[in-house]
Amino acid sequence: MYEDDIRRIALINAYQHEGKADLKSVMGKVMAEIPDLRRDPRSAREMVSRIVDEVNSMSAYEIRETVETRYTSSIRKEKKVEEHRLPDLEGVNGPVVMRMAPSPSGPLHIGHTRMAILNDEYVKRYGGELILRIEDTNPKNIDPDAYHMIPEDLEWLGVNVTKIVIQSDRFDLYYAEAKKLMENGHMYVCTCPREEFKKRKLESIPCKDRDNPPETNLELFDKMIDGTIKEGDAVAVVKTDLKHPNPSVRDWIAFRIIEARHPRVDDKYRVYPMMSFSVAVDDHYLGLTHVLRGKDQLTNTDKQRYIFDYNGWKKPYYYHYGMIKFPGIKLKTSLMKKGILSGQYEGWSDIRLGTVRAFAKRGYRPETFRRYWINSGLREIDAIFSIEIFDSINREIVDPRAYRFSFVKDPVPVRIEGMPNISAKLPLHPTHPEYGFREYEVKGSVYIASRDFAAISEGERIRLKDLCYIRKKGNGIIYDGVEMTEKTKIINWCPEGSRDFSVLKPDGSKDSGLIEPKSSGYRGIAQLERYGYVNFADGDDLAYFTHP
């Protein structure tokens, strides 16, 4: 009498907990919803335990399909809506000016998206400017294509860039600021051998050039620029505190000579600013009000404060969020580039990579990135990226528009003895009948996965999804009607006329089989029933795996 209600509660619980119903939680909800069962709690527990075991024997795909088909209204009622909002920024008295500052070593990867989206969210909240500053001050680590790939990635993410600044256009400004600091005694040119300079810093001993007069430093700096001084023979250094507890902050190098062609400005410059110097100068002249950055930049923030203090500049508000680990995701640009050049990867959008382009090709949506990083917020604690949560967000976004199709991996043909001709009418979406149907005339022959076929026991009743029931008899399969008389295992099938089809997966593997004819011409995200979500991006015969 109550089994249907108990099964509904158990299925929804499993749906909400990654495919496994929790007996204690289900029991509590059953007792709350069905007061009559409280009269005999022992019998009730036995019934609930049996049904929970049945539900937990189902695959995650079966559970999701059943719940989303039968209990949509229930899960909408039970779904906890948790609003996430980024904390307010300090010192906001009007529009803000914020920035993203990637290096042009390649396109953006998933790690960059946090910085981009958090900055974008705050500029949307307060109004103002969001500057894309491309930091190309290391000529040996530049991919020329990155100058257009980075803006393209941001546009796809829905990040509204109001201005693009490229640091290789600003060297004259950096040189002028360096000379001003030298004139005021805050910078000097060091000609010590590299190892000697490093050793002196560690021992808090000043370099022999530290107290040179401004005119000497200015002359040496000009010789660095005009080529008189060779690479490795001199660096320009910002004076700080030689007793600073962090040796990296003590008298840090602000400029070095690099004899390498710059992909964008060729050989126009040979003296290149270090990141902390160019960043401090740009943050001031671009009017930055707030800076969001990872905790790995705390030391650089300390360095940059010296530039602000020496010049009497107003410092922006700094926020340092915790670091995120991305287990199993390839993010190191140099290794990705090496793999592309060697032919290991097909390009920056190869789905084995962690680039924004690869995630887009697999079928992830821009809103997924935004919701994930807003939920993560600006917390200072380190964390591990959860692909499960990321997938769950994307699934919620794409599912309402994802057509359903049947894909049979490693198919075997099955002739069903005694089966009449059946007109199969399968919905393109279980909760959106307005999308239409996939209709087939089935005349006793279908394809099923070899794994499913091998798992059918003698005499076992199996349901071919949305078609009919079958049983195994000896070496054959016989028709067993269309009426549901008991709970049975459900397997997928494809009709005659299905075509060859493959799914490429992010681990580099490929699943091959047959896909039903009605998928022809479809583009975008689809759910291959009892398999997972895929993106049809490159024709009818291939899709990219998105997630379960």
Curated annotation (Swiss-Prot):
It is found in: Cytoplasm. Its EC number is 6.1.1.17. It comes from Thermoplasma acidophilum (strain ATCC 25905 / DSM 1728 / JCM 9062 / NBRC 15155 / AMRC-C165). Keywords: Aminoacyl-tRNA synthetase, ATP-binding, Cytoplasm, Ligase, Nucleotide-binding, Protein biosynthesis. The keyword Aminoacyl-tRNA synthetase applies. This is Glutamate--tRNA ligase. GO terms for biological process: amide biosynthetic process; glutamyl-tRNA aminoacylation. A motif ('HIGH' region) lies at residues 102-112. NCBIfam families: gltX_arch, PRK04156.1. The gene is gltX.
